[in-house]
Amino acid sequence: MAGAAPTTAFGQAVIGPPGSGKTTYCLGMSEFLRALGRRVAVVNLDPANEGLPYECAVDVGELVGLGDVMDALQLGPNGGLLYCMEYLEANLDWLRAKLDPLRGHYFLFDCPGQVELCTHHGALRSIFSQMTQWDLRLTAVHLVDSHYCTDPAKFISVLCTSLATMLHVELPHVNLLSKMDLIEHYGKLAFNLDYYTEVLDLSYLLDHLASDPFFRHYRQLNEKLVQLIEDYSLVSFIPLNIQDKESIQQVLQAVDKANGYCFGVQEQRSLEAMMSAAMGADFHFSSTLGLQEKYLAPSEQSVEQEAMQL
């Protein structure tokens, strides 16, 4: 007698601003998962995505096309994309009919890059909420470009956006600093990498901003934003280079812990293996240190020395 098809499915909702590397992440992660023996289905939820580099199991473009919407309704790219997401929200039976035959696969959802969809517009959140009711356990994987760390003002903005996304999307959440191999192409980091990944004492960033004549006028605003971020104490990041298998493994370990895949029934796992997967994501200092040595130029001063000079 054949076993029943699994009812619970797992996956990642890959979100983030345009250019953060979502599609490249889906390609790299899908190849990595297949190498581990997982059956993977990549679902494109971005109607603006063209020339996809990965094999697409489900494409929202079959339901609604961004170009057609823009022409028919005389909308711009942003307005057209919002309409497409609202149209998908109103036709979730189409999406479920596409996903149900793929039960037993691990899903990667390549989502649109418009920030408002993840910070205050309700369509994408409603779609995710409905999928969880279909017993699809998702982790939101939020990518932001790592080069924002080189600019204190932009990093504070990234922290605010990440926090707003975490509160709005309402899914288990993993934040990634993508393109780690390019992190210092736009300037040197003021602090060690773990300062940014663990979001340590942000008062140091305020001191750096105070040295800029433009941002000195906005010190009180920046202080309030920093206080808000620290009061919630939710945001942290995992550094990612999608070309580095060890880096992908660290991300996957955190995602598996967040959506419960490491405790799933599809694979036989010993208690030791499950505890290793569950706990390992919390102790990645050595991995972060290794990435710093690999991608960042040696710093001549410590954080404490720099702080004393401010």
From Swiss-Prot:
| Ligand binding (GTP) | 19-24, 178-181
- Where in this protein does the record say N-acetylalanine is found? 2
Does the UniProt entry include the keyword Nucleotide-binding? yes
Q: Which UniProt keywords apply?
A: Acetylation, GTP-binding, Hydrolase, Nucleotide-binding
- Site, as annotated: Stabilizes the phosphate intermediate: 78
Motif window: Gly-Pro-Asn (GPN)-loop: 76-78
User: Do you know which Pfam families this protein is assigned to?
Assistant: ATP_bind_1
Question: Is-annotated flag, keyword Nucleotide-binding?
Answer: yes
Gene Ontology MF annotations: GTP binding; GTPase activity
Q: Which InterPro entries match?
A: Gpn, Gpn2, P-loop_NTPase
Quaternary structure (record): Heterodimers with GPN1 or GPN3. Binds to RNA polymerase II (RNAPII).
Q: Which family does it belong to?
A: Belongs to the GPN-loop GTPase family.
What exactly does this protein do?
Answer: Small GTPase required for proper localization of RNA polymerase II and III (RNAPII and RNAPIII). May act at an RNAP assembly step prior to nuclear import.
The name under which this protein is listed is GPN-loop GTPase 2
In the UniProt record, what gene is named as encoding this protein?
Answer: GPN2
